[in-house]
Amino acid sequence: MDLIRQLEAEQAQKIAAKRTLPDFSPGDTLRVQVRVTEGNRTRVQAFEGVCIARSGSGLQENFTVRKISYGEGVERVFPVYSPLVEAVEVVRRGKVRRAKLYYLRDRRGKSARISENTGARARKLNDAEREAAAQERARIEAEKVAAAEALAAEKAAAEAAEAKSE
């Protein structure tokens, strides 16, 4: 493996350690949590729409999400390994036969709908995601409990030191 691919793989592993993205493909309805900076304030904004394409590979991998906002089509291209993408949630699995769904740009109304995939693979992916999300919630809850216990112990030690000095 050449040096550039090796460095890209290391960076991808570093980013993947911080957050995990679910397996999704074109046709899936996604909710992307994006960090937006306005002036000196930073907030997280949700962008929900249909994934119409995935392109690139390695650190340059992107996915395009399309939604209809106030009757106007809006598309955003998100880099998979961008630090601005906080989380991606699969709302529903779509059943499509194409890798690029650019034809949806010309469609309106019912013809732009994508039927839901209820096959075995979709069920397996949904179950795996639910399990991973439950584990993540349990891990976060355990971190909160550990932090609360550490804070309580620190507070008790400070009170004991204060009582000893009196």
UniProtKB/Swiss-Prot annotation:
List GO terms (cellular component aspect). Answer: cytosolic large ribosomal subunit
Q: Where is the signal peptide, in residue numbers?
A: none
- The name on file for this protein is Large ribosomal subunit protein bL19
The organism's taxonomy opens as: Bacteria, Pseudomonadati, Pseudomonadota, Alphaproteobacteria, Hyphomicrobiales
Q: Which GO terms describe its biological process?
A: translation
Species of the source? Chelativorans sp. (strain BNC1)
Q: Which InterPro entries match?
A: Ribosomal_bL19, Ribosomal_bL19_CS, Ribosomal_bL19_sf, Translation_prot_SH3-like_sf
According to the UniProt entry, its GO molecular function terms are: structural constituent of ribosome
Q: Which family does it belong to?
A: Belongs to the bacterial ribosomal protein bL19 family.
